[in-house]
C-alpha cells in the first residue's frame, strides 16, 4: 500500500496475499468490480507457483485436482500443472489454479497432502499476469484488460 501513497483516489486490494506470499495483487478504486471479483460465485481463477520440499507423487497432486477436505469443508477441484522435480535440491515446483478465496487455501491444501509450502507466488488472476513486472512494481491496467475483468465479473 505504501507504493500507492501518491494516488489521487482511494484504492483498495481485490483479495489479499498472506505475509509469506508474493505476487500479483490487484488494486482498484471500483468497489463493485472488487466485490464481484472476490465473490466465489464468479469463480475467478487465481494461479500460483508453489514450491514444496520433497518429490510430490502424482497421486498427491491428483488429490488437489479433485479437491481435498479442509477443516472448513471440501475445496473445489484445482487445476494443477507440474513444472519440475528437482531431485538434487529435493523440491517440487507446480502451478495451482483455484477460484475459491479461502484463507491460506493453497497452503492448507498442500499441508493436507503432506507437503508444506516453502514458497508461494500468485502469478495470475483472471486474465492478468505478472509477466514483465518486477517485484514491488505496479502498473495501470489497459482498457482491454479492464474490459475483460468486467466481463469476468459480469458487470
What is each of the regions a protein language model found here?
Residues 1-155:
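Basic, flexible Lys/Arg- and Gly-enriched helix-loop patches that mediate nucleic-acid binding at interfaces
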Amino acid at each position: 500500500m505504501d507504493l500507492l501513497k501518491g494516488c489521487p483516489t482511494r484504492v483498495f486490494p481485490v483479495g489479499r496475499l498472506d505475509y509469506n506470499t508474493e505476487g500479483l495483487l490487484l488494486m482498484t478504486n471500483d468497489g463493485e468490480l472488487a466485490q464481484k471479483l472476490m465473490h466465489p460465485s464468479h469463480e475467478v481463477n487465481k494461479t500460483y507457483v508453489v514450491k514444496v520440499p520433497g518429490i510430490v507423487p502424482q497421486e498427491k497432486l491428483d488429490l488437489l485436482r479433485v479437491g481435498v477436505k479442509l477443516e472448513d469443508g471440501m475445496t473445489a477441484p484445482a487445476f494443477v500443472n507440474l513444472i519440475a522435480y528437482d531431485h538434487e535440491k529435493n523440491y517440487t515446483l507446480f502451478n495451482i489454479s483455484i477460484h475459491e478465496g479461502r484463507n491460506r487455501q493453497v497452503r492448507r491444501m498442500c499441508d493436507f497432502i503432506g507437503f508444506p509450502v516453502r514458497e508461494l507466488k500468485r502469478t495470475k488472476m483472471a486474465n492478468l499476469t505478472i509477466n514483465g513486472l518486477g517485484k514491488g512494481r505496479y502498473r495501470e491496467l489497459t482498457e482491454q484488460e479492464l474490459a475483460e475483468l468486467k466481463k469476468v465479473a459480469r458487470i
